[in-house]
């Protein structure tokens, strides 16, 4: 909530590493798909990023219209654009225009929208929509992660931007899903308690496997 109502909280408390990867992609006129996770610090990380470049965000409208309006209005102070995750044309258009869109391929939307790939060694339905977005828009994929560290009474915040993912998308959607899951695994190992584990990542189970939830 600090990112919405008290952004000055982050002054002198944050750092950003790897900004040159964003700068380089923008200098080449490329759109950027920022591969991130559903972190509890989503809007804090977005606010910090907005001090250095203009981020956009993919979102799913809330079921409660009042809550949806509140979140949308608050995030409008952080992100350049908020694009519905079902609006593929809007996402492609923004990427073609050179936007940098935060996108999180870390949820289970079933096998109609993905493939099975190991996630921390457990088979998990992994979305593949990012492959289509990248292929159509000619954008690049850049992993981005943000986390909190230090004393809980005086925390620090860091944004970590990694180099562009080479050859993404490839010709193999399963291999691409495995690569994306490995990127997310590496991010979560930095601060595992700050990921939204309640999102039922293993909801879809392969045939013959017992349900977890």
Question: What residue spans do the PLM features occupy?
Answer:
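Membrane-anchoring hydrophobic helices of lipid-metabolizing enzymes
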Residues: 1-33, 68-74, 79
